[in-house]
């Protein structure tokens, strides 16, 4: 067989090589990944936490925050190293793209206060003066006379309109519920 003149053979070999590589690089690993079982004790998100996850995706939070702890000493403050089962119930898994902000894998344990999270969502510099995270004030409203059912967010003076009370909207609560749900399951070795 002369490959210099037999173009059908060249195209056939290229297609065969492409298909073979596709099977070994993409298809077989994907089939193996589908067999991954959830980490024992892992619960699927529901209710406000699930809706908050959708808002997290919509706002692009994964651009600056990761949800993946590397098994390295430098990542020890964020929790144990992540394993495949930690993401078995997520679609898509939210690993993040870069760690401009802190890793959120275990933020539900590290920062469990609803009020702190709401203040941070409204204006991050109100609780972390060096934060470069943008605020999300559109998830809040201002009222002169809040209702008893309103969730009041104690924003410091100068960071909110004068004579106004900051009230968390449903979406703000949903995002915070999602963040509070981010807790690693302990794994027995």
What are these regions (language model features)?
Residues 63, 142-143, 185-187:
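Secretory-pathway/luminal and periplasmic proteins that interact with or process carbohydrate-rich
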Residues 33-57, 69-77, 91, 189:
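Electrostatic cytochrome c docking/interface patches
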Residues 52, 58-67, 175-179:
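The canonical Cys-X-X-Cys-His
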Residues 61, 68-69, 80, 120:
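Sparse recognition of residues in long alpha-helices and their boundaries
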Residues 23-29, 66-68, 73-77, 132, ...:
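Short, solvent-exposed loop/turn and secondary-structure capping segments
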Residues 11-20, 77-172, 182:
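Electron-transfer interface patches adjacent to heme c in soluble/periplasmic c-type cytochromes
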Residues 63, 71, 106:
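Active-site micro-motifs of SAM-dependent methyltransferase domains
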Residues 1-47, 177-189:
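Post-cleavage N-terminal segment of exported redox proteins
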